[in-house]
């Protein structure tokens, strides 16, 4: 990025760069997609709770976090495509460790179990180092296979694990301080709100998408063409399954709490599916980690990413008009951490971020801040701190070769 572009914060790059380019170029469409994920998260934590069920809540619920995770997988390709293997592994693991540390630090009681950064961090630590060198076909096969296999594995694993003291929990610093490592790992891998077994397929889908973007000129259009049918396959397949199988009536007769429990479980999940019926894996419920949810939500994520890339590349006017959102998308970690800290502060002082004034400030404040910040600096505040923390790792391979 040139100094002028770094100061203006409005670089104009195409959606595709050569594999031989010396450093990753900014992809405006990726920034826009990140911004949409951020806005979706803001909505779900504010107006989504205030207004109850509505079209926007249905559109964003569960999908914003999955879009984030797909984009995290794309970032693996951006981070490693111009680095050697050892430097890439060190950077990925280092990034993961920092994300885990930040996630634990902001997982306060006043925030509640909504912090996903620990899961993201372990994706970078445990998964990314083993998949970043896969070719496109291998990455795509890994994503497709895990989308089916890991929800099934999670289902049967959770049947033999002891029930957690609460559902929808996340790994927190409190668990670490209390030495509750068993619960920490159980929440992280299998029974928490963001279990790795459910998020690995999403992350791998992003890795495959990132490799595709740098391998094919028309990749963005193919992402749109692939994402739409995947969305309808997962969501429509779930709808069809519910009607053809008469699931609601049969499950209501089975469950001790009858139709009331069935209705609740069909619209609410806390990271995992119930383990009484395998059929839950074929039903779309936000935040359930079912096969249907993974297929549908990764599909719509690919569609959004492809559409954002096409729109930003095809129209200079559109690209300029959405630059406030693109600026927000260039500091996703800063926006996320600031949002979580705001929730914790307001909750601790008897307020709710869903109150109209706070909700509006929570949405507009980060956008205005990003617009001002990128007139002066190249990276977001937290992103710059991470860059400084990881920079020494780049010198390790050269030192080892001496």
How would you name each of these model-derived features?
Residues 2-402:
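Alpha-helical transmembrane segments and their immediate juxtamembrane cytosolic regions
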